[in-house]
Amino acid sequence: MQINIYSIAKKDAKYQALLEELCMQCKQFGVEIKILNLLPQAVLKAQKISSAKAQQSYTQTFLPYIALPTALNLILHPTGHNYDSQSFAKLIESQHIVQFFIGGAFGFEESFVRLGKSVSLSAMTFNHKIAKLVLCEQIYRALSILHSHPYHK
């Protein structure tokens, strides 16, 4: 299984070690996680203009990545479906490619959200750094469940 996490964000060295540790732990289950932080100039400019322009720029940034027809595309969204750890594990089970999309501060255009399955990590709002950590931990937990590893207990 290949898991790709795309985020509108800069790489942050303070969180990188924790992310790398979680990604490394997933390798024991034959899963490779790639995290791609995207913050092109077009996004930086658009965020200064309006929330609508920012959302459009996020869509344009992510479109080349969501176009993969064989992937399960999961879009993190505050109104997305809430999963417990067991059902999240079932969601990603048997998938060859799973892709997660974490938008910028202004969220996603509805047209982009409809291109995948909307998922919420929590009713609370997290910054991108924390959201990525929580997501990676939940991916590791899901893989632990699927492989009967004691981590989940």
Swiss-Prot record:
Q: Which SUPFAM superfamilies match?
A: alpha/beta knot (SSF75217)
Asked if Transferase is a keyword of the record, the answer is yes
Main site of residence? cytoplasm
Give an example GO cellular component term for this record: cytoplasm
* Enzyme Commission number(s) from the entry: 2.1.1.177
Q: Which Cys-Cys disulfides exist here?
A: none
- Give the multimer and partner information: Homodimer.
**The protein, known as:** Ribosomal RNA large subunit methyltransferase H
Source organism of the structure:
Helicobacter hepaticus (strain ATCC 51449 / 3B1)
Its gene name is rlmH
